[in-house]
A protein has these predicted regions:
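Intrinsic low-complexity/IDR segments
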Residues: 1-160
Length: 160
């Protein structure tokens, strides 16, 4: 268990990590590369810019990955900045279910905090929400949440 720790800018190459719970910690810009992660639970932790390059992920669970209250300005800055933002994290995850373990609580948090997204951030988020195989058996458990989130994100875009 990792609790209230600063692991930002860490680098884990070729590691096999199993049964890890991470609470109220900073994982921002941490790199997991050429390894394997089994049963990783992240709660109330910062994952902006965390990268899972060439890493096999089995059972990533995320809950409240944007702890605290988030303002429109803060979210658009941290979410949209491609090199350190959460989109870098999502793009590095090949495993679609793991992506949605991050996307779904992310959208729910944005709605909770009444955040309005910049248009470019909205388009990018929308692209990730649509990036799944509707016939995949492992995606079926996410479909209801994905559809709900896609409806919700239409309400959080800045109307230019």
């Amino acid at each position: 268990t990792i609790e209230k720790s600063d692991l930002s800018y860490g680098y884990y190459f070729g590691c096999v990590l199993s049964n890890i719970s991470c609470f109220e910690s900073d994982l921002s810009n941490t790199i997991f590369s050429n390894g394997e992660i089994n049963n990783f639970f992240i709660k109330k932790s910062n994952i902006f810019g965390t990268s899972f390059t060439n890493t096999m992920i089995k059972n990533l669970l995320c809950e409240d990955i944007m702890p605290g209250r988030w303002t429109t300005q803060l979210v658009n800055k941290h979410l949209g900045y491609r090199y350190t933002g959460v989109f870098k994290t999502l793009a590095s995850i090949d495993d679609k279910p793991s992506r949605f373990e991050i996307l779904i609580p992310l959208v729910q948090t944005l709605v909770r905090d009444n955040v309005k997204l910049n248009n470019d951030v909205y388009k990018e988020l929308n692209k990730f929400m649509h990036d799944y195989d509707k016939t995949s058996s492992e995606m079926r458990k996410y479909l209801k949440s994905i559809n709900e989130c896609m409806l919700l994100i239409k309400n959080i875009v800045h109307q230019d």
